[in-house]
């Protein structure tokens, strides 16, 4: 049964990482637990999954494959809403990525910046999903009323349904997306939008997470209120920002984020100040 659990759900998080890199294992664990939580798995179920992994790592230590176990998220923290990043913090991270590019001339840092800007611009689920977007999966439509160009992405085979469409923030559409397109101007329509020169999407994501974790720790941004903020926290930023700007649009935010209003409350908003502020405004409206 333990092998079945691993192969059915967990292997995709661990099969392409270097087990000797403790931080990579920790990042994979956080991704796994975050997705189990968002799938509405109970504490008991999540504990069973982490027990399987704990036994696996103990066996690996015993056989000299790894030197130590990665850090396992504590259950009391698993159940809390994940702290988001503030916009100015994400800007700091982007600035640092550009500095790393200037220092190393490695364009992977620039494309990591593209990835962060993409997932903060719309209701994407951070992970492999945004990396699978190909050039033919975006289009522009014109809002006849405002004459504004709206950028629409079409995702296939998502976590919850076979096809999902979402729109991007206008700032991203006008200022960031053109930069992404010109980074690889000769790409064909069936080429990946991000990191088109890399075939293995899992390896790309693993490296993105590794860079993100290192830089946010160096900047003193990885932890907030005693909790870690992995790359998935950017999804929380997007949802909370949209809610703060327009609390009446909760159903639209849920639809754009490919989830339900119930999930938005339980996993993104209920434990956050943005919800408390909005409820305060409703309780004590200014006359």
Where are the regions a protein language model picked out?
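Catalytic-site neighborhood detector that most strongly recognizes the C-terminal catalytic loop/helix
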Residues: 84, 157-161, 257-282
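C-terminal secondary-structure termini that scaffold catalytic or DNA-interacting sites
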Residues: 142, 186-189, 198-199, 282-287
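Basic, Lys/Arg- and aromatic-enriched nucleic-acid-binding interface segment
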Residues: 43, 47, 66-67, 72-127
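Conserved tyrosine-mediated DNA breakage-rejoining catalytic core shared by Y-recombinases
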Residues: 131-176
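Short, basic (Lys/Arg/His-rich) helix/loop patches that form interaction surfaces
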Residues: 101-106, 186-189, 209-255, 261-262
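C-terminal catalytic core of Y-nucleophile DNA break-rejoin enzymes
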Residues: 157-178, 189-214, 230
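Short, charged phosphate-coordinating catalytic segments
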Residues: 58-67, 119-149
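Short, Lys/Arg-enriched alpha-helical recognition elements, typified by the DNA-recognition helix
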Residues: 1-59, 73-76, 94
């Amino acid at each position: 049964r333990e092998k079945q659990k691993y192969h059915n759900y967990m292997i995709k998080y661990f099969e392409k990482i270097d087990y000797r890199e403790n931080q990579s294992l920790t990042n994979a664990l956080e991704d796994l637990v975050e997705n189990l939580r968002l799938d509405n798995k109970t504490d008991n179920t999540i504990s069973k999954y982490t027990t399987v992994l704990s036994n696996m790592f103990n066996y690996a230590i015993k056989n000299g494959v790894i030197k130590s176990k990665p850090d396992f998220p504590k259950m009391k923290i698993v159940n809390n809403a994940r702290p988001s990043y503030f916009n100015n913090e994400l800007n700091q991270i982007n600035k640092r990525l550009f500095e790393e590019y200037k220092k190393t001339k490695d364009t992977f840092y620039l494309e990591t910046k593209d990835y962060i800007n993409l997932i903060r611009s719309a209701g994407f689920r951070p992970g492999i999903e945004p990396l699978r977007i190909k050039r033919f999966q975006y289009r522009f439509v014109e809002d006849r009323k405002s004459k504004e160009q709206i950028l629409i992405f079409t995702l296939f085979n998502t976590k919850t349904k076979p096809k999902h469409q979402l729109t991007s923030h206008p700032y991203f559409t006008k200022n960031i997306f053109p930069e992404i397109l010109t980074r690889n101007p000769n790409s064909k329509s069936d080429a990946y939008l991000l990191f088109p020169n890399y075939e293995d999407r899992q390896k790309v994501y693993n490296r993105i997470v590794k860079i993100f974790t290192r830089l946010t720790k160096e900047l003193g941004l990885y932890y907030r209120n005693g909790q870690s903020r992995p790359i998935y926290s950017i999804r929380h930023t997007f949802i909370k920002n949209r809610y703060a700007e327009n609390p009446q649009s909760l159903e639209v935010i849920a639809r754009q984020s490919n989830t339900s209003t119930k999930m938005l409350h339980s996993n993104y908003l209920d434990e956050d100040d943005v919800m408390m502020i909005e409820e305060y405004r409703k309780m004590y409206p200014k006359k």
